[in-house]
Amino acid sequence: MFHAIQVLLLCVFTAMLGLGIVSPIMPLYAESLGATFIQIGLLSSAWSISRLIFTPVIGRLSETRSKRKLMAVGLAVYMVVSILYTLAWDFTSLFSMRFLHGLGSAITIPLALAYAAALAPEGKEGRYMGTMNLSIFSGMGLGPLIGGYLTDEFSLSAPFYVMSAMTALSLLLTLIILPEEKSRSSIVRRSAPSFRKVLSNKLFRAAFVYRVMDAFGRGSVMYFLSIFISGSSEIGGLGMAVSVAGLILSVGQISMAAMQRPFGVLADRYNKVRLILLGGLLAATGYALLPNAYTVWEVMMARLVISTGAALAMPALTAIVTIEGRELGLGTTMSVFQSAMSIGMIAGPLLSGLLVDLIGLQRIFYVGGLIGLTGTVAFYFMERLR
């Protein structure tokens, strides 16, 4: 079990590192190809649209097929598309490659989480899923820092080559070390449940709605955060270096990662619902602080408030999904839960791309906070009425 968890952590870390590496440069890359703000939002949504389409299908398939082999396919897609990014010649080609990137994510991340959830002992779901979330946020946190540095020191293409090399390493270790799931007695195969059955579970449905709204709010602002930090004052930006944007994004994600395991232990000991509600309120407050930040430290502090809220809520939320998934089917449950994020990440950037053109860059952060607050309130009432 120990070696399996290690490999799963590495797979998730590498996949999310690749995503994090390109996050501070993708809007700039698209802008260099002549993309508008709305197209930049659409580019972010391409990744999530792909995940929304393929994640539930892969989740159901994983109930009766080898998760190890499917994960290897997903990592291979990641590796290839990383190189293809450097060959983009216009917005349409970049959009297509972003869509393929989402396919790799749809295969890799939910299956790694489902595999880890199946290995989690009862009563330690928060600890195990907090550890997996640590890997996710560590990759996303270090990625922008590396991506910003490589862009400033080398070129816009350099981060994509690094992303491909890291994914190739993860793929190799998956094939060599990760055991076949069917060889483990602790993992039971079952027929794939329907999506309707999964969503008919009231507690899971409340978690699903919270995740949709959380991703909606996050997607509305986070994709434009690098533009807010490094963009010119004419568009409402702060005019800082790309590496500074990468640093702020990284500190936010790394701090979130560092809090995942202790907050996971907290989720195993205390009321998970209350932790989710408190986390949602904190994150919404952080979004509202961003447009009032003018220095590096002020932006950093607002980002840390968002990170603390997200870190508090996520282990408790994924622990609930794990517990309910044992009865429903972990592969399908994790995939549907991941689809919730995709729905929000599709709508969020599209809405923000439109609103930035209408109301300005800075006001979009208030919109993101309001959306996150709405999701928190919706979760509270849905959980009470179940």
How would you describe each model-predicted region?
Residues 81, 92-100, 286, 297-305:
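Paired small-residue
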Residues 48-56, 140-141, 253-261, 345-346:
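Residue-level signature of mid-helix packing/kink "hotspots" within the transmembrane helices
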Residues 108-120, 312-325:
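Intracellular juxtamembrane helix-capping segments at the cytosolic ends
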Residues 1, 179-209:
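Juxtamembrane intracellular "pre-TM" segments in multi-pass secondary transporters
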Residues 53-89, 267-273:
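Conserved MFS/SLC helix-loop-helix module at the cytosolic interface between two early adjacent transmembrane helices
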Residues 97-136:
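Cytoplasmic helix-loop-helix junction between adjacent transmembrane helices
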Residues 165-184, 375-383:
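C-terminal membrane-cytosol helix-exit motif in multi-pass small-molecule transporters
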Residues 25-37, 223-243:
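Short amphipathic helix-loop junctions that connect adjacent transmembrane helices
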